[in-house]
Amino acid sequence: MTSWRHDSLGASSSEPLPVVIIGNGPSGICLSYLLSGHIPYVKPGAVHPHPLLQRKLAEAPGVSILDQDLEYLSEGLEGRSQSPVALLFDALLRPDTDFGGSIDSVLSWKRQKDRAVPHLVLGRNLPGGAWHSIEGSMVTLSQGQWMSLPDLQVKDWMRKKCRGLRNSRATAGDIAHYYRDYVIKKGLSHNFVSGAVVTAVEWAKSEHGSPEVQASSPLFQVNGYLTTKDHGHQPFSLRARNVVLATGTFDSPAMLGIPGETLPFVHHDLSALEAALRAGTVNPTSDPVLIVGAGLSAADAVLFARHYNIQVIHAFRRSVHDPGLVFNQLPKMLYPEYHKVQQMMRDQSILSPSPYEGYRSLPEHQPLLFKEDHQAVFQDPQGGQQLFGVSMVLVLIGSHPDLSYLPRAGADLVIDPDQPLSPKRNPIDVDPFTHESTHQEGLYALGPLAGDNFVRFVQGGALAAASSLLKKETRKPP
C-alpha cells in the first residue's frame, strides 16, 4: 500500500484532493498520465498532413496543446467519432491512420512536475479495468496501434516482449498487460488504488459555481471500501474538488428478462464458459452451448467454443441481413474471424443441413423461457415455438454501466433524463471541449459514459478534462 493510499483513503484527511478518478481503464490511465505533468507539444518542424490543422498548429509554436483552444483546433476535423476533441487528439497521435498510413505522431511529451495535479485513480481491478476480465486469447476489435496510450506504442511494447501483432491486432491479454505495464513504466503507480469499490459520491446542494460553499467545504464526498487480501472490506472516505467518472460499461450485463434466466446454468459473461471447460462440465460430447446475442461478445464466445470443438446453438433476434448488425459494418480484410462468424450465421439454420459441424444459428428467434431440465424455449419468426436441450446458456446482449453510487444512479446527468443511461443513445451530457457535466460543476465523464466507445477515441476526453482541470488549478487562489 502506497503512502497515497494510506493518507488519502483515511477518514482524517484535512485537505480535499483536487481530483478523484473513478475507474482505472484506458480513460483513467490516460488522464492520470496528463495530470502527472506529462504535457504534449507539437514537435519542432513537424508538419501535419491535414492542411487546416497544420495552419492552426503553426499559429502557436511552443505552446502546449493543453494550453491552446481545443474548440478552435478541432474545428473542421472529420472522422469516426462524434467527439471533436477525440478527433483532434487522434489526429495528433495518428495523423493518417484512417488512410492506411503510418506517419509518426506530431506530438512530443515533456515532463513538467510543477504542472502536476494531485489525484487518485480508484479501480476494482488492476490498472486496465475491464480488460482484465476479458478472455486473454481473444483478439481485439481495434488494431493494436489504436489501443496505444500516449508515448508508448503497443507495437513497440510488444516488440520488447518478443511478441508480434496478429493481423495488426493484439489479444485482450496483451492489452491488459500493456495497460498495467504502462502505469508502471510511466511512474503513475502511486496514483492508483486497486481493489477500491466506490459506494457513494455525494455533492453539496449549492448554486452552480457558488464560491462561498466551495471555499468552506469540499464539493464532493467519495465513500467506498477496499477489498483486503482476506476478502474483507476496509471502508474509506475521500473529499475532492473534482470527480471524474471513467468506469466504462462492463459493470452490469444486460438481461433478457425472461423466466429461468437466474438458473445456475444461465450465465452473462464469457468467463463462465472458460470455467466450465476447465471443470469439464462442458466438452465436445456434451449438449450444445446456447449463445444468445449478435454482437462482438457473442461472436467471441462462438469463436472460443468452436476452438475447443464445443457444439454451439447461436440465437439472435435480428435478421442476418440487418444493416445494423455489427458484422455488416466491419471490413472483411481487417476482421477475418468475425467475417467467418457472420458467414456461419448466414449459412446455417437449425433446420437446414450444416457444412459447419457443431454450429447452428437461430436468426430472428426470441428466447421465451429457460427450464430447470436445461431446455431452452424460443419463438421462431413464424410465431411457433422451438425447444432445444443445452448444456449451458451464455446471454451476451451487451452491458450497462453501474452508477448506483451516484444520486438517482446518475439519471439527472444524461442528455435525456426521461430515458435510461445508454453509452450509445443517451450518454452523460458533457461539454464536448472540457468533458465536464453540463448539470454538475466539478463532475466529469470519460469514455463510454460520455459516448466514446473505442480506446482510440476515449483519450480525447482525457485531453479535454485535463485541459479543464489544469486551468482550474492555475486559477485556484493560493
Curated annotation (Swiss-Prot):
Keywords: Differentiation, FAD, Flavoprotein, Growth regulation, Monooxygenase, NADP, Oxidoreductase, Phosphoprotein. It comes from Mus musculus. GO terms for biological process: cell differentiation; negative regulation of cell growth. Transmembrane segments: none annotated. InterPro entries: FAD/NAD-bd_sf (IPR036188), OKL38_fam (IPR029731). Its EC number is 1.14.13.-. No monooxygenase catalytic activity in the absence of NADPH. GO terms for molecular function: growth factor activity. Its cofactor is NADPH. Its main location: other. Belongs to the OKL38 family. This is Oxidative stress-induced growth inhibitor 1. The keyword Cytoplasm does not apply.
